[in-house]
Amino acid sequence: MPSSPPPDGGNANKTSIKPVSLSLGSSKKLPIKKPVSSHTLARRPHHNLPYHHDSDSDDNGGDSEPAFQSVTGFDTLTGRTLDASGAEEKKPLTIPVASGNNWRDRPGVIRRSKGKNLLPKEVQALQEAQSKGEVPGDGDAVGPSMQYGLSFAKQPQNDGGDQKMEDAALPAVEAAEKAKPLTEDEIALQALVRESRGEVEGRSDLVIESTRAGEGEAEEDVNEFYDGHNSETRSFRADVAARPESATLEQYNTIPVEEFGAALLRGMGWKEGQAVGKGKYGSADPSRASTPHIPARRPGFLGIGAKDVSNGKAEVELGAWGKAAMRKGSKKAGEATKNGEGNTEGIYMPVLMRNKKTGEMITEEELAAMAKEAKKRDDSEDWKEERDRNSERSERDKDHHRDRDRDRDSRRLEYDDTYRYESRRNGSSRRDRSRSTSDRHSRRRKYEGDDGDRRDDRYYRDRDRERRSDPVRDRDRNRDRKSRYYDDDRNSSWYSSSTASSKQRNRDRDRDRDNDRDSRRRK
């Protein structure tokens, strides 16, 4: 007995439960929809499947069958489906960056030990897949197998019977054959055999076993091996050996030029829709991660490193330069001021300079004014120095004239002294001659009587008195002459001083000669 036809698709969608009808014929069974419980998990949407077509809509009443897909398994780490046909969906081109291409990982570089990664293996594998650009779509990833919350250990089920014990397999002990040391006869015999075969070089039987880092060995031990004494050559060879192989021409041809940059960024962890720059790929803030970095425009007429003190008001047009652009900007600024708007386009902003000694900030105009004042000050200082030099020159001229007059006076005095000395010496010679004559007369009158003797005694007394007074006068005269000569020698030139000294020596020599002659006569 056929059942009544079901209601329309639209009404069926509105109702939660359809009426059940039975049929005894071979008619096709209609699917029965069960009410959705809030305790059950939502099904994975079909649009995540690779063979699902978005063109399929629900206009057919929801009776359209999904696309056929044969799945052989699931990846427990990344949550990807393994297709039986082996066909893979087209993935965006990605150029992975070699993780070993880091200078910190090179031999000879001191590396710090990394902390232990406490994340589950599933999360670590998911992060590694994301770094390689193999992240599945939304909803495809399977969560980690770790259970959160309160968990109980599973109790073994024991029915109370005897448990079957299996015999443990005994490890196979292999007898290691120990190599016996060769005797001297055997060594000599092997040497003869090698010589007969033409093998001149002998072979050593020694074996040095190398220890390799096992899987359970700590990473610090491996780092200690690399952190040993490594020369530059060893480090260079290790770096060259760690380099990947060069790409072939076919590999270059398979990568389109317009997709190379995006593929390289994907290999570095970049995703579609993210902003490029400033390293904000993994930012937790989505707005910050998707906001592109726009470089700030440099204010007008400012060089590299200069700071803008106008708060961004010194903007000029591209290509504007010179006084014409400044006048144009000033006109615009005047019009804007009249209209009530603060347009300062094209206004020249002076570059401030800092004085290293005082720390004062000055402009170019102030620096030029300071340089002009410094020049005037230098000119005035030069005039003062010139005046001082002129005064010193005049003083030197006066001293020169004074010395010349003094030399002339000294020469005149020397001439007078020489004249007096010569006249005195001539007078003394005449006196000596007269004395010698009187001596002869006295000797002649010696025999003449007592009157002659008295006259001779008076003459001798007068002569002795004169002699006693002459040395005192000579000493005073010599002292005055020496002091005068000393002053002349100190203030006069070298020639005048040498001349005076020579004359003085001559006078002293003459005086000594006269004294010697007088002394001889006195005897």
From Swiss-Prot:
Residues 1-165, 200-230, 275-300, 323-347, 359-523 are annotated as: Disordered. The keyword Transport does not apply. Residues 372-440, 447-491, 505-523 have a biased composition (Basic and acidic residues). Residues 257-309 form the G-patch domain. Residues 12-26, 67-79 have a biased composition (Polar residues). InterPro entries: G_patch_dom (IPR000467), Spp2-like (IPR045166), Spp2/MOS2_G-patch (IPR026822). Transmembrane segments: none annotated. One of its GO terms (molecular function) is nucleic acid binding. It holds the Pfam family G-patch_2. Coiled coil: none annotated. Involved in spliceosome maturation and the first step of pre-mRNA splicing. Belongs to the SPP2 family. Associated with the spliceosome. This is Pre-mRNA-splicing factor spp2. The lineage of its organism: Eukaryota, Fungi, Dikarya, Ascomycota, Pezizomycotina.
